A protein has these predicted regions:
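Short, conserved beta-strand element in jelly-roll/cupin
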Residues: 98-118
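Conserved metal-binding segment of the jelly-roll/cupin
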Residues: 127-147
């Protein structure tokens, strides 16, 4: 079940609120300019699936997003607990960073924890299959896939180079809860 935990930056151990209803999550994130939608991930995709397999299975949804928002690049991140670089990838994604463009993710399998640092608050969004999240350009955030990742997410970009992170150098991510395996 998707959820949203909202923390004040001074209280990383105690959330101000925890939401589990889709409408509540979507409206709370919309107040911060973050899009949170539920799309149908109908194809049976397992973590570890190839990029070609995932894109082929979800071409209709990808085309819709690309047309709707003008995205020009798409890729897939598909990780399971056997991935040889899971520790390195987790460490990189756990560093607070921002992008010069919106960060769009459509989860077609598994789950991951997207954590957004907006002003004095931290929004921890547990994304699961069928969740689409679009984080506005410039928003500080990090992503936790857990010690034993199990997810597939389609990523869309305005930048032809794909995923380009600008790391903040802040250690805030280490103070907040991570995805529990």
């Amino acid at each position: 079940m998707s959820s949203l935990s909202v923390y004040h930056v001074s209280s990383p151990d105690i959330p101000n609120k925890v939401l589990t209803h889709f409408e509540d999550i979507a409206s709370t994130l919309a107040e911060q300019g973050v899009r949170f939608d539920r799309w149908q991930a109908a194809a049976k995709i397992q973590p570890g699936a190839s990029q070609e397999e995932v894109i082929s299975a979800y071409q209709e949804q990808i085309d819709k997003l690309m047309t709707e928002r003008g995205y020009i690049t798409v890729d897939v991140i598909s990780l399971n607990s056997d991935h040889p670089q899971k520790a390195e990838l987790r460490a990189k994604f756990l560093e607070e960073h921002r992008h010069g463009e919106d960060e769009v993710r459509f989860f077609v399998a598994g789950r991951g924890l997207f954590t957004l640092h907006i002003d004095d608050y931290v929004y921890a969004v547990l994304c699961e299959k069928n969740d689409l999240i679009s984080v506005p350009a410039g928003t500080k955030h990090w992503f936790d896939m857990g010690e034993n990742p199990h997810f597939v997410a389609i990523r869309l970009f305005n930048n032809p180079e794909g995923w380009v992170a600008n790391f903040t150098g802040e250690d805030i991510a280490g103070r907040f809860p991570r995805l529990e395996d």
